[in-house]
UniProtKB/Swiss-Prot annotation:
This is Phosphoenolpyruvate carboxykinase (ATP). ATP binds at residues 194, 213, 229-237, 278, 314, 439. It comes from Campylobacter jejuni subsp. jejuni serotype O:2 (strain ATCC 700819 / NCTC 11168). Its EC number is 4.1.1.49. The gene is pckA. It holds the Pfam family PEPCK_ATP. NCBIfam families: pckA, PRK09344.1-1, PRK09344.1-2, PRK09344.1-3. SUPFAM superfamilies: PEP carboxykinase N-terminal domain (SSF68923), PEP carboxykinase-like (SSF53795). GO terms for cellular component: cytosol. Disulfide bonds: none annotated.
Amino acid sequence: MKKFDKLGLDNIKEIFHNLSYDELNAHEKANNEGLSTDNDTFCVDTGIFTGRSPKDKYFVKQDPSSKYIAWGKVNQPITKELFDKLLTKAKQELSGKKIYVQDVFCGASLQSRKAVRFVTEIAWQAHFVKNMFIRPSQEELENFKADFIVYNACKCINEDYKQDGLNSEVFVIFNVEENIAVIGGTWYGGEMKKGIFSMMNYWLPLENKLSMHCSANVGEKDDVALFFGLSGTGKTTLSTDPKRRLIGDDEHGWDDEGVFNFEGGCYAKTINLDPEHEPEIYGAIKRNALLENVVLRADKSVDYADASKTENTRVSYPIEHIENHEPSLKAGHPKNIIFLSADAFGILPPVSKLSKEQAMYYFLSGYTAKVAGTERGITEPQATFSACFGEPFMPLHPTVYARLLGEKIEKHEVNVYLVNTGWSGGSYGVGKRMSIKATRACINAILDGSITKCEFENFEVFDLAIPKALEGVESVLLNPINTWLDKNAYIATRDKLAHMFIQNFKRYEDVKEGIEFSKFGPKI
C-alpha cells in the first residue's frame, strides 16, 4: 500500500494492482459489471455516454506548456484552481473503496514510450486499459515509474459546472505540467485511450518525432504502409490484410528508427460486423476481448446488427488476437502513405497520387464525412474537415505535425495517395458507397507498386494525378465525372467541394507554413 501513498487517496479498502486477465474477468463477474457472451467474451454497457465527449475536454493553462498548445474549441483552457478542485473531487470519489491500478506503456519504441498508471474503481475499465495499451513484462512492472497518471472517477460528476463555466457535469482534464489527467462523469472507455493519445501528440513533436492518427501494416518485403483517416473511413478494415502483418490499427509514432504502435490492442467498431467481410476482427472477439454496448440475444450470442444502444458499438482486444500481427509492434520507415476519405459528395476519385506538397495540404485538410455514432449528436454522414485526420487529439498547431510529415516524406522518399472510400456516382443519398472490392484493388495496386507503372491524367480543379486504368477497378470509376449521370450537377458539386476546401484552409493561414501549403489545394 505504501507505494501508492503518492496517489493521494484516503482509506483505500484494497488495491488490485496489475491483475491478470483471469483475475479481471472474475472481478467483473463478481461486481456484476456486465455479461458474458456465448463464447465467454465479457460485454459491458458504458451508460449514457457511448462515444467521447469532446466538448468536455480541457487542458490546464499554465506555463511553459501554454505557449505550445493551440488554444481554441478543441483544446479548451481551464484554470489550475478548477483542475485542483475537480481532481480533489475525483480523489474523494475513489477514496474509501477498492480500486484497480493498471500500469502500462504507450509506445513500442523504447526511446519514445511513456509509462502510464491508470486508477479506476471499475474492473472492466482496468481490463480496457490492459487490452488497449502495451502490457509490460514482469521485470518492467517491478521497475515501473509512471510518467503520467490518469484518475478515472467515472461515477463522479461536477454539479457546479455552470458556475465553473464548463460545458456539462462531465470533465476530462489534462494537466501537462503535473502529468496528471482526471476523468469524471463518463464511463466511456475511449476517453482513456484517446486521452493518452492526446498527450503523446503533445510530447512527441516537441522531441521532433511525429505522432499520427493512423493504422499501419508491413508486407513480406518489410515495406511499411500507413493508413490515415477518421473513425469509420476504413482504417481498421483496410489495414487488416491477410498478406501483411498488422503493426497497429489507430495510433502510431514515427521516430528516427521507423514507425511504432502506441498501443498493444485494437478498438474496432462492431456495428454490422460480418465474419465473411472481416474475419480477422470477428475472430478476435473471444475471451479477454471486451465488448461495449452491443445487444445479446437470449442464447447470449451477439446481435451485431442491433444499434438500439448506439451505432458506435465497439470491441477492444489485445493485438495478439489478430493472428497476423507484427509481434514487435514496430517496423522501419514507410514506403507508402494512404489518406482515406469517405467523401459524402461523391467527387473525390477512388485513388489519386499526391506530391509531397499536396500531401501536406490534404493531411492538414483531413477531409472526410463524419460517420454515425463516433461522437454524440452525429446520426448520418456529414462533410467535415479534421486537421491531420485527428484534430480532436492534436494539442499543438496542426502545421507542426504537417511540417514533420513533410520532412519525413522527403527524407524517406515516401509515396502518398488519397483514396476515397465514400460515395461514387452522386452525393450521399443519390450515389452509392464505393465497393470495398474496388477500394481493396486500389490499395493492392499501391502496396504492390503496380500503380506507379500506370498512365496518369489530371483531375481538374483539384489538380490530382489519377490513373487512366487500374487492374481490378472498372475504368469508368477512376474519374468521378464519368460516374455521374447529371454532368451539370457534378460540376456544381465539384466546385462547391473545392470552395469548402479553400474556405477551411484559411484557418491555417495564421502561420507562414499555412500560407505556403495553401497553394497546393484546389483552384476554382
